[in-house]
């Protein structure tokens, strides 16, 4: 009888710890990030792309100059082929107070335009694109997204993604 009661206690502890692990995992899903591929600009030899970040209520993501707190988003290409340079662009941000600290960033949804400069438009672009950022609500959480890029620039067509990326690009301050 004693062993059976110990077994029940252990079973209850295991079940409660696994439900905590699931709820912690669910809390991690405060955002969604997607890579959008747009059209190829053959005059300037770049692929227009974007990282779209959709945030849950009350979550924010920082701008390139976050203010007194926070870290700006950044892009890193890993094992990339046929790319000479990548420019991550930032649409005009909003001003927020985070624990009485002035910060700059975005809420709800943002597309960060990318200009991916191509060495040879007749060759495939492929590799890994890594997006790093920090999102905040009551706390700040670093995020990392890995995207695979396989794209043939010369075959690009205008798509819904192109229109959305161009809208975001039009919101980038002209100092870029």
Please name every model-derived segment.
Residues 6-16:
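Bacterial N-terminal signal peptides
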Residues 1-4:
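N-terminal secretory signal peptides that target proteins for export/translocation
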Residues 20-176:
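Extracellular/lumen-exposed scaffold segments
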């Amino acid at each position: 009888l004693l062993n059976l009661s110990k077994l029940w206690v252990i079973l209850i502890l295991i079940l409660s710890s696994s439900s905590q692990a699931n709820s912690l995992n669910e809390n991690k899903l405060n955002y969604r990030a997607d890579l959008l591929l747009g059209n190829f600009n053959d005059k300037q030899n770049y692929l227009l792309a974007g990282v779209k970040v959709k945030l849950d209520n009350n979550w924010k993501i920082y701008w390139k100059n976050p203010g007194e707190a926070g870290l700006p988003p950044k892009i890193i290409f890993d094992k990339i082929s046929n790319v000479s340079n990548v420019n991550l662009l930032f649409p005009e941000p909003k001003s927020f107070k985070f624990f009485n600290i002035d910060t700059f960033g975005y809420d709800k949804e943002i597309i960060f335009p990318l200009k991916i400069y191509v060495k040879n438009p007749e060759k495939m672009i492929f590799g890994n694109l890594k997006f790093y950022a920090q999102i905040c609500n009551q706390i700040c959480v670093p995020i990392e997204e890995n995207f695979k890029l396989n794209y043939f620039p010369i075959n690009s067509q205008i798509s819904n993604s192109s229109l959305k990326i161009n809208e975001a690009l039009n919101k980038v301050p002209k100092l870029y």
